[in-house]
Curated annotation (Swiss-Prot):
Record-stated family: Belongs to the UDP-glucose/GDP-mannose dehydrogenase family.
Keywords: NAD, Oxidoreductase
Subunit composition and interactions: Homotetramer; probably dimer of dimers.
Organism of derivation: Methanococcus vannielii (strain ATCC 35089 / DSM 1224 / JCM 13029 / OCM 148 / SB)
NAD in keyword set: yes
Catalytic function, reaction form: UDP-N-acetyl-alpha-D-mannosamine + 2 NAD(+) + H2O = UDP-N-acetyl-alpha-D-mannosaminouronate + 2 NADH + 3 H(+)
Binding site for UDP-N-acetyl-alpha-D-mannosaminouronate: 155-156, 207, 211, 214, 245, 247, 258, 318-319, 404
Binding site for NAD(+): 19-20, 39, 44, 91, 130, 326
Record GO terms (molecular function): NAD binding; oxidoreductase activity, acting on the CH-CH group of donors, NAD or NADP as acceptor; UDP-N-acetyl-D-mannosamine dehydrogenase activity
Name of the protein described by the UniProt record: UDP-N-acetyl-D-mannosamine dehydrogenase
Coiled-coil regions, chain positions: none
Its EC number(s): 1.1.1.336
Catalytic residues as annotated in Swiss-Prot or TrEMBL: 207 (proton donor/acceptor), 261 (nucleophile)
Xref: PANTHER family: UDP-N-ACETYL-D-MANNOSAMINE DEHYDROGENASE
Length: 427
């Protein structure tokens, strides 16, 4: 393999052109690499070519156009020979009989199998998809050729992907040192943060630890919220003051945890060991929050003696100011309300698609009895008095349940609204 070790990587094939693959392919192309972007969806490939993709990410369209115009990026439905292959496909969680979940590696394995005919001795294969420990080594064994394999997990936040692709530190774990060093040569072309080299098992575990830490912290905040509801304390005030301590950093509670990372990744640790009971408990607590919110809604409607209520949900995406609805707590809240035969209209200024019908603001609130805020979009934070007055006219009852603590409560109260805040037992 000596002759290949001296070969400079010039051509890269990126498999999967979603939230991570498309920005990564575009970034590499803009930094001089010949990039083949591959997605099995012909519809998606055509959308990308036309700049008509459904990813709401600042700067991405400009970056993509620059990559395509430079002739360094070509998007296709099939891979071809290259010096390096980067796999950026989803790794969702699938349910198990015991109520837990585990990683669905089918997309990763399909991606690996799709590039097998094009892999030559000395090529580099990088897995960016989040995977359980020991998976990178298994992929190397599947390839069964003298190649280099590394894991470089993505660590970006939707809405800030391009900024964080460049500025964030990266971790690269190889099946051997040479694999990690080869991958580092690629990423240092655009990464301004530090790049840490380790083995593949450690890199896999680091990514899972990062998101598990946040999931557990949110679970703690959610448990505090439930306790504060019970004992008459405002959890938001309590957390704010507790965080004044220099060694305390409690995150905010909310209606649950969604997205393709934090709500999924802890299960990849749980599936590997029986010693992850605390991690599993936190994950299950967060998964139950949408049902806690549903019970809050029903309780407040009963307190107002509202028969046959209609509910309006503000926010379908899993977090604020993105269009991504994957694993959104909003869906679970609406599911739970539907089981109680409570009709729901959903308004979201960012979501492009959702399991339930999306309505305009005006249509969603007509004759509604309750507005439930489930996502912290800027549009919800910045309602002006005139807009609130117009909303008020269309409602049947003026009840708001704010699970994100983002509304200007004084403005809404002046318009006659009753506001119930998640975790505020003091109201």
């Amino acid at each position: 393999m000596d002759k290949h070790e001296k070969q400079k990587i010039k051509k890269i094939c990126v498999i999967g052109l979603g939230y991570i693959g498309l920005p990564t392919a575009s970034m590499l192309a803009n930094h001089g690499y010949e990039v083949i972007g591959v997605d099995i969806s012909e519809k998606r490939v055509n959308e990308i070519k036309n700049g008509d993709f459904k990813i709401e990410e600042p700067g991405l369209l400009t970056l993509l156009k620059g990559a395509i115009n430079s002739k360094n990026l070509n998007v296709k439905t099939k891979a071809e020979k290259a010096d390096a292959f980067i796999i950026c496909v989803p790794t969702p969680a699938i349910g198990c009989d015991d109520g837990s979940k585990k990683c669905d590696l089918s997309y990763v394995l399909d991606a690996v199998n799709s590039i097998l005919p094009y892999i030559d001795e000395g090529n580099l294969i990088v897995i960016e998809s989040t995977i359980p420990p020991e998976t990178t080594q298994k992929i190397y064994d599947i390839i069964d050729k003298k190649v280099y394999v590394a894991h470089c997990p993505e660590r970006v936040l939707p809405g800030k992907i391009l900024k964080e692709l460049v500025e964030n530190d990266r971790i690269i774990g190889g099946i051997n040192k040479k694999s990690a060093e080869m991958a580092k040569e690629i990423y240092k072309s655009f990464v301004e943060g530090k790049i840490y080299i380790t083995d593949s098992n450690t890199a896999e575990m680091v990514k899972l630890m990062e998101n598990t830490y946040r999931d557990i912290n949110i679970a703690l905040a959610n448990e505090f919220a439930k306790i504060c509801d019970e004992i008459g304390v405002n959890v938001w005030d309590a957390i704010k003051i507790a965080n004044k301590h220099p060694r305390v950093n409690i995150l905010n509670p909310g209606p649950g945890v969604g997205g393709h990372c934090i709500s999924i990744d802890p299960w990849f640790i749980v599936e590997k060991t029986n010693n992850a009971k605390f991690i599993r408990s936190a994950r299950e607590l967060n998964d139950k929050m949408p049902y806690y919110v549903c019970n809050m809604i029903i309780s407040e409607l009963k307190n107002l003696n509202i028969e046959k209520p209609k509910v309006t949900v503000f926010g379908a995406t899993y977090k604020g100011n993105v269009e991504d609805t994957r694993e959104s707590p909003s869906k679970k809240v609406i599911d739970a309300l539907a089981e109680k035969n409570i009709p729901v209209s959903t308004y979201d200024p960012h979501a492009n698609s959702f399991e339930y019908e999306l309505h305009s603001l005006e249509d969603s609130i007509v004759n509604s009895d309750c507005i439930v805020v489930l996502t912290d979009h800027n549009e919800f934070k910045s309602f002006k008095k005139e807009e609130i007055d117009e909303i008020s006219k269309k409602l049947k009852n003026k009840l708001i349940i704010d699970t994100k603590n983002i509304l200007n409560h004084n403005l809404w109260k002046k318009a006659g609204f009753k506001i119930k805040l998640l975790g505020n037992g003091a109201w």
